[in-house]
Swiss-Prot record:
Function: Na(+)/H(+) antiporter that extrudes sodium in exchange for external protons.
Keywords from the UniProt entry: Antiport, Cell membrane, Ion transport, Membrane, Sodium, Sodium transport, Transmembrane, Transmembrane helix, Transport
Catalytic activity: Na(+)(in) + 2 H(+)(out) = Na(+)(out) + 2 H(+)(in)
One GO-annotated biological process of the protein: regulation of pH
Gene3D superfamilies tied to this protein: Glutaredoxin, Na+/H+ antiporter like domain
Cell location: Cell membrane
The name this protein goes by in its record: Na(+)/H(+) antiporter NhaA 1
Length: 622
């Protein structure tokens, strides 16, 4: 049988279609749905004859001259196809460590600590039931969380406003992935052979060199990566780690302004004189403006979500379910150890670590995120599935024990989902959600974090969630000025971000620019410039305002490029989502030290002054 290589154009079209499906649908639910369907198909297929086992154990040999690699289909999936999955995981880890959630160590401290506890306690509980023998080597099965399944389950059974919980679980999952990858590298490598390993390292160095030489053709990288994979396979190191190592080598950075401008110039040149040279130059210019990490992540993520992981589940989740199989699993310390580790270990480890840290450092949990919600999310983290089944294949040689382990993984996933649902419903009963949310300010004003005009201890507070490109926010600045003039030092005014990307394409960049200016002590000057020119907020214009203010332009541009303060904008947007408002400007006002109430109705100066006077009178302030 001859297999022709798909053309790059065909692959791009397929990737684009998969990405379109992902973008037009709730991708958490959809990817989890693909995985669930594949699991059910595997279970049905495995129980209707012998074709399941015979198909996945079909030998496939790749031979070049006298050299060959022969694996059955299942191991081509587990050792070969899953390399792409781990490559995408590596890209995500590198991105989060460089420009994502894990760059802010204080922000990530709670989920990182929770992830460590969620790795350690399940392994300890597993080893209590399986202290020795072949079963003990499978302790790695219980340490990992299946991000796709967990986020899908969270979307289905989670709380009404799960935005902050989702961010918490995502951050925890990235740390969890790092731990699982390290575990595979250090504990599941057998018969290490140094010669092939050195060749594999040479392959990684070649990829670094290709990047330095600015080689952009994917074929060159594919050839070197394939050779590196073979070298690692022959060395005894699990070859899927090649995907992780290559991903960690590739650079990730926010788009550089100079390269974006250069790409625009090349595109204009092609439009004015369309020819192959300009077309190629424009294409390369656009590619270089975006880091290779983000381009590859965007390209390959749909493949892993909708093809690779479901195929892996189809190849690994098939268990022949008979009365004897279930009876063996019910008596098996291995199966019970997996259930205990994933269900109890994850729930107790993550929840207890979070509770302890939040007790030692009050305010470390994001506002609106309760410990009962974290308990529900921790229960869902017991859905190990993908990497759990992957480690079953690495750790257990006996087919009988492997079947018991798979039953344990599947059982734990079901119990974890039901337990998570029950904990979320219990949380809703103890802390019933109100019909109308966000009537009071969710996150209290923090003078050390928020942007304040006026004394921090002023008796009255006015908070605005605004958008620098919003014409209504711009007009409201006059009202705010009059309100501040009326109350003087008795009022503190707080500005928070809510860029409306759908209607204001420059608002997010303007918000980032204001935060970059704040880092140099010039937030309010930039704030005033941006609102005074709300109809002129292109990047060049904003950089011009920064220059007028005398900012350190190198530092200003670098802070924006690296997204150093993006998390501040994200926090403000999460406030809006959790409080169920989408419009700007949105005001909260009241006496300082009380629950600030959301203002509805006109926001002219006279109305805001009257409302603040009423709040002062109600509080009994002088």
């Amino acid at each position: 049988m001859t297999v022709e290589q798909s053309s790059p154009t065909t692959l791009r079209r397929l990737s684009a279609r998969l990405a379109l499906i992902r973008d037009d649908t709730d991708d958490d639910k959809l990817s989890a749905g693909f995985l669930l369907v594949a699991t059910i198909l595997a279970l049905v297929w495995a129980n209707i004859g012998d074709s399941y086992e015979s198909f996945w154990h079909t030998p496939v040999t790749i031979q070049i001259s006298d050299n060959s690699i022969s694996l059955d289909l299942k191991h081509w999936v587990n050792d070969g196809l899953m390399t792409l999955f781990f490559f995408v995981v590596g890209l995500e880890v590198k991105r989060e460590l460089t420009i994502g959630e894990l760059t802010d160590r204080a922000r990530a401290a709670v989920p990182l600590l929770a992830a460590i506890a969620g790795l350690a306690l399940p392994a300890v509980l597993f080893l209590i039931l399986n202290p020795s023998g072949d079963e003990a080597t499978a302790w790695g099965v219980v340490v990992s969380t299946d991000t796709a399944f967990v986020l899908g389950a969270l979307a289905l059974v989670g709380p009404r406003c799960p935005a902050r919980l989702r961010v918490f679980i995502l951050t925890l999952a990235v740390a969890d992935d790092i731990g699982a990858l390290a575990l595979i590298a250090f504990f599941y490598t057998d018969d290490l052979r140094l010669g092939p390993l050195l060749l594999g390292c040479v392959g990684l160095l070649l990829i670094i060199q290709l990047r330095k030489l600015e080689v952009w053709r994917g074929v060159a990288y594919f050839i070197v990566a394939a050779g590196t994979w073979v070298a690692f396979y022959e060395s005894g190191v699990h070859p899927t780690l090649v995907g992780v190592l290559i991903a960690l080598i590739l650079p990730v950075y926010p788009p550089r302004r100079s390269e974006v401008e250069r790409a625009g110039e090349l595109t204009r040149a092609f439009r004015q004189s369309p020819n192959s040279d300009y077309a190629r130059a424009a294409q390369l210019g656009v590619l270089r403006a975006v880091s290779v990490n983000e381009r590859l992540l965007r390209f390959y993520q749909p493949y892993t979500a909708f093809l690779v992981v479901p195929i892996f589940a189809l190849a690994n989740a098939g268990v022949v379910i008979t009365g004897q199989t279930l009876a063996d699993a019910a008596r098996s310390p291995l199966a019970w150890g997996i259930v205990l580790g994933l269900v109890v270990g994850k729930l107790v480890g993550i929840t207890a670590a979070t509770a302890l840290f939040s007790k030692l450092r009050p305010g470390s949990l994001p506002p609106g995120l309760t410990l009962s919600q974290i308990a529900g999310g921790s229960a869902l983290a017991g859905i190990g599935f993908t990497i759990s089944l992957f480690i079953v294949d690495l750790a257990i040689d006996s087919p009988e024990l492997a079947n018991e382990a798979r039953v344990g993984v599947l059982t734990a996933a079901v119990i974890a989902t039901v337990l998570g649902w029950a904990l979320f419903r219990l949380s809703d009963t103890v802390h019933p959600p109100t019909e109308v949310v966000g009537l009071t300010l969710l996150r209290p004003v923090d003078p050390g974090r928020d942007h304040l005009r006026g004394p921090a201890d002023a008796p009255l507070t006015l908070v605005e969630y605004g958008d620098f490109e919003c014409p209504f926010c711009s007009k409201a600045t006059g009202s705010i000025r009059d309100v501040r003039a009326h109350f003087g030092d008795e009022l503190r005014y707080v500005f928070r971000h809510l860029p409306l990307d759908d209607v204001h394409p420059h608002a997010r960049f303007a918000a980032q620019a204001s935060e970059a200016a704040a880092a140099q002590g010039r937030f309010w000057e930039m704030h005033d410039h941006l609102f005074a020119n709300s109809d002129a907020l292109a990047e060049d214009e904003i950089f011009g305002y920064a220059a007028e203010l005398g900012l350190d332009m190198d530092r200003f541009e670098e802070d924006i490029r690296r997204g150093t303060y993006v998390h501040r904008i994200d926090d403000d947007e999460l406030d809006a989502e959790s409080s169920d408002f989408r419009g700007t400007p949105t005001f909260y006002l009241g006496a300082t030290g009380t629950d600030l109430a959301r203002h509805s109705g006109p926001y002219d100066a006279a109305t805001l002054i009257r409302k603040l006077e009423e709040a002062r009178g109600a509080d009994g302030a002088p």
